[in-house]
Amino acid sequence: MKRTLIVPLVTNGNSKVFEYNQFDCIINCVDAVSSLEISKFDEIYFILNKQVAQPWRLEEKISADVTRLNHIHFSFIILPSMTDSPAETIYKALSVIGWDDRCIFIKDGDNKFALDSTPTSGNYIITSSLENLDRVDPKHKSYVKTDEQGFVTNCIEKRVISDKFIAGGYCFRTAHMFKEAYEALKNYNNTFYISDIIYWLILNKDEKFLPVEAKDFLDFNI
């Protein structure tokens, strides 16, 4: 079974993720994955949009920085147009990568965190606590609620239902399950989030997702 890391970078024209950070002049999207155990993955895909990638020569810039991460195999998928949501970005990327039984780990490009162990199988949501942040804008985050066994029972955008927010990392046991959920939700709404994908799978397919606590969470947008 392949293990694939997917890093969606530009959606709805948001290009802030490509500013150089103040720490070590590595492009933020590369810094975003640098604390993960990337050697566990068979491949890494950076997802770009043509409108931003070409004029800024992003493939060239990102490639130069990725080579510092110890000989990983990486590729770019250049989407022809902007997408309406992160979920659509992943769906279009997987249409190129393939709808199979590979495990996919989705990592947002606008933050950084470390994990005790990076999951490469099963269903997981990377979370952190509002209490761990010195500065936070709670309105712009997604939140999860868990049951007594620790499984996620609800995840929702922009509404605080617990102190646990989604830290920008998601592991799905197969790419195909993401496809099934996306196409089901697409019948009802054109714009939805990865958290909606997860909630649909919990409700309709009895999939179990476990939260994994992020360490040293850093939001590049704050």
What are the language-model segments listed below?
Residues 42-44, 102-103, 208:
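Residues at the starts of beta-strands that form the adenosine-phosphate
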Residues 47-49, 77-81, 212-214:
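Conserved beta-strand termini and adjacent loop/short-helix elements that scaffold enzyme active sites
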Residues 53-59, 63-146:
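Conserved beta-loop-beta/alpha segment of the NTase-like Rossmann-fold superfamily
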Residues 1-55:
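N-terminal glycine-rich phosphate-binding loop and ensuing alpha1 helix
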Residues 112-188:
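Conserved core of the sugar-phosphate nucleotidyltransferase
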Residues 25-32, 89-92, 197:
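Well-ordered alpha-helical segments embedded in enzymatic catalytic cores
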Residues 5, 163-222:
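Conserved alpha/beta core of the MobA/IspD/sugar-nucleotide pyrophosphorylase nucleotidyltransferase superfamily
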